[in-house]
Amino acid sequence: RDGWPNDVAFAPAAGADDVLKQAKLYHSISEATKTISLLFATTARKRVIGTKSLSIFKAIEKSFEHVVNGGNVGFLFGPEQSGLSNDDVVQADYTVSIPINKEFSSLNISQAVLLICWEWNKIKMSFLNDDKNLVKINKKLKKSTELSNVGDREYFYKQLDELLTKSGFFYSSEMAPVVKRNIRSLFNRASLTHQDLRTLHGIIRSCLLYTSDAADDD
């Protein structure tokens, strides 16, 4: 809104210049998260779009374990006035809620970020205080999950959308956005690996070839 980088931001950052200097500006969530393999969306209200929900404590535990095993983790925070839209949330693997007074469930973005970072730092310090864990980190672990990243999933959704559009699956233009969100939610709940995506791409290619051959025969 005010442009970035912005010199005005450094004074209230109270010396955290390194953090600000590493901050990057992106024009879309898909662009910002394309290398992320486990994405969480913070939300104050219960969603009905099918995305799995975790408490902040479970989310931090799961995210830290993923990082230790070589994955990339991201947390999405929405605008203070409106929060994340359903289209934003459906791009995440999980939604995260912070347990606070239900009558005052809205936090400003700095408070939400602080709480997530505080819980993350707590589990990190506990982990690093165990010498056995330090040895484990230094051993260059093999990824236990090899989850696909958001960028790869976005490409898959684009290909799938093309196939479903050609086949006439979206019979109602009004309902198409809702159906697409539901499809994303369905696949995101499956925690797709790179191998899963390769298999799904193979299925899509086969279907596209079939429909193309059928059209030629006609």
Regions found by a protein language model. Give the residues of each.
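Structured adenosyl-cofactor binding patch, chiefly the S-adenosyl-L-methionine
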Residues: 88-137
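An accessory alpha-helical subdomain
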Residues: 130-208
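Short, acidic/turn-prone active-site loops that include or flank metal/cofactor-
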Residues: 1-2, 46, 100-104
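S-adenosyl-L-methionine/SAH cofactor-binding core of RNA-modifying enzymes
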Residues: 3-82, 125
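Conserved small/polar residues in nucleotide/adenosyl-binding loops
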Residues: 210-218
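Long, low-complexity intrinsically disordered regions in eukaryotic proteins
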Residues: 77-79, 86, 97
